[in-house]
Amino acid sequence: MDAFGDYVWPRATSELILLPVTGLECVGDRLLAGEGPDLLVYNLDFGGHLRMVKRVQNLLGHYLIHGFRVQPEPKGDLDSEAMIAVFGSKGLRVVKISWGQSHLRELWRSGLWNMSDWIWDARWLEGNVALALGHNSVVLYDPVIGCMLQDVPCTDRCTLSSACLIGDTWKELTIVAGAVSNELLVWYPATALPDNKPVAPDRRVSGHVGVIFSMSYLESKGLLATASEDRSVRIWKVGDLRVPGGRVQNIGHCFGHSARVWQVKLLENYLISAGEDCVCLVWSHEGEILQAFRGHQGRGIRAIAAHERQTWVITGGDDSGIRLWHLVGRGYPGLGVSSLSFKSPSRPGALKAVTLAGSWRVLAVTDVGGLYLYDLEVKCWEQLLEDNRFQSYCLLEAAPGPEGFGLCALANGEGLVKVVPINTPTAAVDQNLFQGKVHSLSWALRGYEELLLLASGPGGVVACLEISAAPTGKAIFVKERCRYLLPPSKQRWHTCSAFLPPGDFLVCGDRRGSVLLFPARPCLFKKPGVGPKAITAAEAPQAGSSSGGSESVVTGLGPVSSLHSLHGKQGVTSVTCHGGYVYSTGRDGSYYQLFVHGGRLQPVLRQKACRGMNWIAGLRMAPDGSMVVLGFHANEFVVWSPRSHEKLHIVNCGGGHRSWAFSDTEAAMAFAYLKDGDVMLYRALGGCIRPNVILREGLHGREITCVKRVGTVTLGPEFEVPNLEHPDSLEPGSEGPGLIDIVITGSEDTTVCVLALPTTTGAAHALTAVCNHISSVRALAVWGVGTPGGPQDSHPGLTAQVVSAGGRAEMHCFSLMITPDASTPSRLACHIMHLSSHRLDEYWDRQRNRHRMIKVDPETRYMSLAICELDSDRPGLGPGPLVAAACSDGAVRLFLLQDSGRILHLLAETFHHKRCVLKVHSFTHEAPNQRRRLILCSAATDGSIAFWDLTTAMDRGSTTLEPPAHPGLPYQMGTPCLTVQAHSCGVNSLHTLPTPEGHHLVASGSEDGSLHVFTLAVKMPELEEADGEAELVPQLCVLDEYSVPCAHAAHVTGIKILSPKLMVSASIDQRLTFWRLGNGEPTFMNSTVYHVPDVADMDCWPVNPEFGHRCALAGQGLEVYNWYD
Amino acid sequence: MGRTSKDKRDVYYRLAKEKGWRARSAFKLLQLDEEFQLFKGVKRAVDLCAAPGSWSQVLSQKVGGQSSGQVVAVDLQAMAPLPGVIQIQGDITQLSTAKEIIQHFEGCPADLVVCDGAPDVTGLHDVDEYMQAQLLLAALNIATHVLKPGGCFVAKIFRGRDVTLLYSQLRIFFSSVLCAKPKSSRNSSIEAFAVCQGYDPPEGFIPDLTRPLMNHSYETDFNQLHGPARVIVPFVTCGDLSAYDSDRTYSLDLDNGSEYKYTPPTQPPIAPPYQEACRLKKNGQLAKEFLPQECSIDRVDKLSQPLAIHTLLAPKVEDNEINCSS
Ligand SMILES: C[S@@+](CC[C@H](N)C(=O)[O-])C[C@H]1O[C@@H](n2cnc3c(N)ncnc32)[C@H](O)[C@@H]1O
């Protein structure tokens, strides 16, 4: 190939960019969003739905968009056409767009104009654009032909952190400049003399004690707002800023953010601010906070826009998410807390408990045994009954269902349970169940067919009552169906119950934190030896002594399956069955996804609610399929959405220890609680979900540290994926069979995300996030990739096992199953199951206790992972793969993954490197007539790479690993087969590829920007008949070795040998560079500037011959490139 | 996580406290000197972006040899006084500050100009890289006024997308430009130091404070952006082999046999910008949003919005979100 061809091929082109949203602007009913150098245009309909109309690509080259300015139309007609100035960094471009009738077309774009300095603000002045530049100067620019008309500096030359231009003509142009010294400088560029001598500031305003990041001027009211590093927003009365010498008065100093404030925007009636704390606050002009929008994740909100007519605020975050919020001033209509004025001379006694039957009926009992009903339609209290047997102790629970099934139940301290039909309380039925106190009551409803009431009595006995109604509706029947027995514990009662569809089992939670499974109809378990065993009082030592006699009396059925203490000592608070899973919540601040397989309960995933919500009280499934979490955060009751990370409702109820009830129907959500001797009711019309908050889902809120492609799912034509991103560019036939790459990413935000990247649409869908890590995730490894059903009975889709590891020396193992699902936007369903976890500090604590070691946890981080598998083509052989971890404490550790990842066990370690180990990588070596060999390479901050032979590590009697000094401690890995000093400092990327000659190419990239490539030969010593027993150690040697010292200008964090002739590298200098291999030194072919800063990891894979290769770059964002082979 | 956790994760942070340095950065300058003998023969030095002052501490000890040298330290932030160091509080990119610094060297130029300047990073990478480059260029502009021919200039540099443009700019003024990374600077950090030796401005160059030095742009040379001809200066790792590894987590009992004792920070920050906000937060006095307050049910039904009394002073709540170091 000639030199020129070489220079062009292969050429990487950007397919997809996920970056912080740094520019947002509403134009009519359209939303402009900047993402990297691209402009995204969305249509907003009145419901607040957002539909992407078009991506206008690459407006700013390698700059990122920071803002848009739409040229004002004198005729006010922006509905069919608009001229938009797009700026960011030092770049400016003008683009003309026609967008009538929802069809969007780019009519014209100017050149990309490079300024000499950073652009802080831009403003249209009669067809030209004024720009406020980085060192406090203003230029007037003709954006059509690209020439500078004016260039006026300020006498006070300094760097700015923000600027705001005001006025519509050059003559009246005013700049408010935010200097790094925290001052605001107001000056008038047009007062410059013809020679453009610097202009002196007209006014200096100080007040903030940190730099000013954003400003907004409201001409109609003469107000200026500023947002600062000092975490405050200031409101200034400035009058008409275009008039020199005016008075500036600070009329508001608003502290509400708990971190730096990035953005501020003045509206006619509100002030909007947003910042690093991910909160968007709505203030009155007087400085009161009216609303707070929380939901973005990570490092903050970077852009805000407002649609004043629709009263929407739109925010864009570092998480690349875009959200829409409703401006309603002081709270949502139809939402509020009211006291139901129970106290009255006609209603004696004090309130003891409250419950809700649907969202319209409140029930309450008093300490004189009175049961009262409050109907919100009638708006008055009515006594249903009075029974003095319930005066000293009384439990009250209404039946579930939208109208509470019209039933409630009472229970007292003497084992009495009363079931009351609310409409005909006289038909109430009493049941004397126990000799002692009823500890708890709960209901379980199956469709509208089966209703059970469970009551816990002394000794862990749970009576299960079957409730049915007469066809007339006038009478009810209560029949005891059976009794269950809970596992022994101090506080031995159940707390919640639910039917497991189809209805053969009941799932219960107990006060001890266990989740239990009981047969719903034990009569069906007649056959001996099948199903649960009846436990007798004699067998259950702590069972109630109620029956008095010592003979074997059957007290109840034990659980068929249980997860002991799943939620810890504080207890389980709810169980819910939905979509094939069981969800349990607890006062440990977590909720679990469980499932029942073969009559056994199995945990799938543990999830945490928002910070501070340590008491989760329950879950609700919203009609749109999303879930909300109910719980208590200090004194507040909170409804929280895991999907939008938003606190949907906050009620200051005083905490969860008092009696409370929650109900959610389509019409309204209600929360009732007792406070100051009265019943309080919070109600929100329209249910607990707020519509259309998320315009676009965010990805990770913080830096992405690792990316790994898992595999590809092929969808048949029946799953045709609509191309939203490029509706125009779609050529007929290009829909094809949908190929979707599945990629996982790990982030400093402590989550692992599963992404679907279709090859046809250039979109990314976040399928699921795994939130088990307590610290940042830094490394991922995948093994056992297959299809659902396995090789024998293969179904479309993808299965794999994943290990993730990171800060606090924590490692998790989970399995992934992705199947086609036409009902989701991504056309995929993703199921995750958590398999196991490991924490080094816990392990050390155990060993310290056992061996009196004095090893103190040095807060180790895992930096990199590699699956080491000898026979990946023959899974199931041997004890399971190993996973090697590079550790910051200087160790390389080997873990054994047994039982498909259900057991994670620390096997061996070595402190050979004595430095922070940055990378591990493994490969196998094959040679004719020889056993396949498994080689691990590890590389550290001193630039050395060590090679280890792990072939026989798992063999019985192998000497690869030296036994530990104490049993239970890890084995020692001995000395490496070879070490190579590849670099003078840290190795940030490492890859190998077998060569046709039977050797291996090893490539590494370093912190100093250098590349190192060498050929490694693996030789086995001749087998000597005499000592066939002794282990053979391969001899590794370096054949030819090359260094490229200044390959990149920063850390080389990604390297991949694509073929023995071609290599690609990626660096923090934002270059993706191709290198030709094979004739001596690697030679530069070409490089592409990409947009993601701080790239920490790269993965490349071939898709298919037509599509070529794909490459994912992960850093402060994610970008996907592709190139043809 | 306890207070020792940062000591475990960052050995240089811990050593700095134990050795009385105001910041761990002191080791960076010491390791740079180990490699380049920066302080040899230096009598007058400028420390730009000096707060909290660990580089000034190092300079005041090492500069001047027997006779006392002169160190001028400049920072935006207030800095606790140091014996023998002249302090200027101001923005080094501001004309007036630059003039004030230059005054001190009229007639007697400096031998060494160092700048460890870093903006308070915003997390938007392009902004941060730009702001950092402006500090370097402002420092370079000051250096062109105060540095004697053959003098040395050391400045922090972020190795991002456009770093090669800065290298080519520095090469105009110095006979040797290297990129150095002390071992005490982490692998995971994009910071490095441009070590520029042999100040030798182009013939006919007239320093001009009033016009800021602008970074070059790629416009003139496509090869600088995509091609192989970028100016990537040689890279040097500094610090001897036995130096601690700043990326490694060490257990509290280091191998040198010394027993660990917790040391509080040498010099806490003086009046950081977030001080007032933290104080308010601590006292639960940050403004809180409107929460539906109590009112009777009839009012709820009659009014489209419930009435509320807004409280500006919220009750004390647990503070677990932001770590106020004040
Ligand atoms: C990394 S610290 C320097 C630490 C210092 N070398 C030491 O050893 O203690 C960076 C300093 O740059 C300062 N800085 C940032 N922008 C500045 C500016 N425009 N003018 C002056 N100082 C600035 C900050 O206030 C901060 O103190």
Swiss-Prot record, chain A:
GO annotation, cellular component aspect: COP9 signalosome; cytoplasm; protein-containing complex
Main function: Together with methyltransferase FTSJ1, methylates the 2'-O-ribose of nucleotides at position 34 of the tRNA anticodon loop of substrate tRNAs. Required for the correct positioning of the substrate tRNA for methylation. Required to suppress amino acid starvation-induced autophagy. Enhances the STK11/LKB1-induced cell growth suppression activity.
Tissue-specific expression: Expressed in hypothalamus, hippocampus, cerebrum cortex and cerebellum.
GO biological process: G1 to G0 transition; insulin receptor signaling pathway; insulin-like growth factor receptor signaling pathway; negative regulation of autophagy; negative regulation of cell population proliferation; tRNA methylation; wobble position ribose methylation
Gene3D superfamilies (UniProt xref): YVTN repeat-like/Quinoprotein amine dehydrogenase
Post-translational modification N-acetylmethionine, affected residues: M1
Protein name: tRNA (34-2'-O)-methyltransferase regulator WDR6
Pfam assignment, any one: WD40
